[in-house]
Amino acid sequence: MSAAPHASPTTIACLLGPTASGKTAAALALAARRPIEIVSVDSALVYRDMDIGTAKPSRDERASVPHHLIDIIDPADAYSAASFRADTLRLIGEIAARGRTPLLAGGTMLYYKALTQGLNDLPGADPDVRATLDAEAERDGWPALHARLAQVDPDTAARLAPNDSQRIQRALEVFMLSGQPMSVLLAAPRRTDDAAAAYRFVPVALEPSDRAVLHKRIAQRFDAMLDAGFIDEVERLRRREDLHPDLPSMRCVGYRQAWEFLDGDTDYRTMRDKGIFATRQLCKRQITWLRAMPERIVVDCIAPDSTARALDALERVLDGSTPG
């Protein structure tokens, strides 16, 4: 008796792109054509009470099509790539069971990589270790911890700025918990499982043919956030005793700069300029991640008909008319 043939993997369309590239418009355009549910691939949208600075889809937009992995945790808590992977694989199955089509949409490329390529064997976050490192940074400054990292993990330290508190803390935490440099663990083969083997993830990438145009959009959007009450949003968060600027939520682009302004460390214009610059740097990193995906389908996000082009690409993916 011959073995039963393996079922072909189910194609999952993934709409990826940097900040301000038009992902929401393209996703909603697809929702007008097909019964989809959107799974957010965004590490900032997971937080409740952080709406303006994360450019969260509006209530009307979220009412028009089901969205997932938005407003799922408190800003005092953390959410990992491993949690995203587990939640997304579960949601894909649940959405399909309802007879609907999942669409992954967002710009957190680390999440997408964890989903499609598996996880590294890095230790999880340890609150006690982080508290110790925070106390040392408060006393000695992050550049001193960066110098310590350079002694135990020179490869990781070389690619981090001396004040990149989030990444310096994580790299030292990994070394303290595992006894191995994070660069060594990241270079090891990824831990895979069969959970994602049933799916073929196809990325449609919104990328700018002229980055200056996207940079202008980013500045306009940051100004619109300020006009919409972003500083008031951060002030409400800042009043909470359990929130501080070193939490992952408050390290989100824009929030850190607004917190510094409210602390009196910068003036309004400097805060605005730093927020726009940080967003552009994020955009640059996102595009670098995208360009490392040879399998992606590229749509020019600054073309006048970019939404229609993205919609056409997504429909071709879902109809199976793209190369396997």
UniProtKB/Swiss-Prot annotation:
Gene3D superfamilies: 1.10.20.140, P-loop containing nucleotide triphosphate hydrolases
Site feature Interaction with substrate tRNA, where: 108, 130
Recorded superkingdom: Bacteria
Claim: Transferase is one of the keywords in the record: yes
Binding site for substrate: 19-24
A GO term for molecular function: ATP binding
Cofactor: Mg(2+)
E.C. designation(s): 2.5.1.75
A Pfam family per the record: IPPT
UniProt function note: Catalyzes the transfer of a dimethylallyl group onto the adenine at position 37 in tRNAs that read codons beginning with uridine, leading to the formation of N6-(dimethylallyl)adenosine (i(6)A).
PANTHER family linked to this entry: TRNA DIMETHYLALLYLTRANSFERASE (PTHR11088:SF60)
Complex and partners: Monomer.
Name of protein: tRNA dimethylallyltransferase
Gene name of the encoded protein: miaA
